[in-house]
Amino acid sequence: MVLLLNPLENLKTYISNRPPLVIFMVSVSAVAIAFLTIGYFFKIKEIKSPEMTEDWNTFLLRFNEIDFCISENETLKHGLNESITPESTVTSSQTRSSTQSPPLLEDPGPINISVAITLTLDPLRPFGGYSRNITHLYASVLGQQVGLAGREAHEEMNITFTLPVAWNSDECVLHGRCEQMVFSTCMTVTAASNVFPVTMQPPHCVPETYSNATSWYKIFTTARDSDTKYTQEYNPFWCYKGAIGKVYHTLNPKLTVIVPDDDRSLINLHLMHTSYFLFVMVITMFCYAVIKGRPGKVRQNNPDFCQEKVALSAG
């Protein structure tokens, strides 16, 4: 009865005599709190799906690492009231790739996907601009330049930027030098279907409606990925008399693949049940410590029994 009337004393005795169990109780309590917090986090937050390693956000962000060089020495291609069609964007490079390895029967061939993206053109000082109205920029890159691996690393992607307004040397003459230009362009990527992510696509743009010029000039550009800047292939005079183009993609939360609500609810339920079980375990041990905290008295050995045991051993 005395022990039952002194719960605080029992608890102190339990803590002082059983430190391993106390540490175990504290550890279990910490794990239970962690599970409870993680479960609540899964309930209120949208979590990116770990099963989908690449979506359109990550795919377009890789183009931010590419430098495009618009050089004065490039040849202009002239067109009259012509639009960028799937046939016009397919170049001889795709013909070369088809001759190297026979296409699979299931391969539908190159496809076009057009998305709106920001393009900056930063002319270097020797660059004087173009007297013609440039409305289209064209480039060709490999999959490895945008971070693709495996078979997709050797796939060629043809990129066409359709400018909303013509780009020429009028601004250069007006300011005495060419200033940086920022365009909201329509970027058309032509490549094999396996290059593109299989997740929800961003809103598409229509290249034919992006530029209202009756006649246009397409200029071919060269591309360089960011890794080249740190290798022996780096050329400090690359694009010396030209303009460097950079692509900037703004993250679109709608393109990120998230864990479905049903899965998040199931995860939250499992974590809650686990934390409740651990809390019940800790509470049970705590109640035991309060009710019966003092260890039982150690039974003392009988001296006569010890002497008899010694005598038997000596005999």
From Swiss-Prot:
Topology in membrane: Multi-pass membrane protein
Subcellular location: Membrane
Region (Disordered): 81-107
Pfam family, one: TMEM219
GO cellular component: membrane
Keyword Oxidoreductase: no
Keywords in alphabetical order: Membrane, Transmembrane, Transmembrane helix
Disulfide bonds: none
Transmembrane segments: 22-42, 271-291
Major site of localization recorded for this protein: membrane
Annotated Low complexity bias: 88-101
Family named by the database record: Belongs to the TMEM248 family.
UniProt name for this protein: Transmembrane protein 248
Organism: Danio rerio
Upper classification of the organism: Eukaryota, Metazoa, Chordata, Craniata, Vertebrata
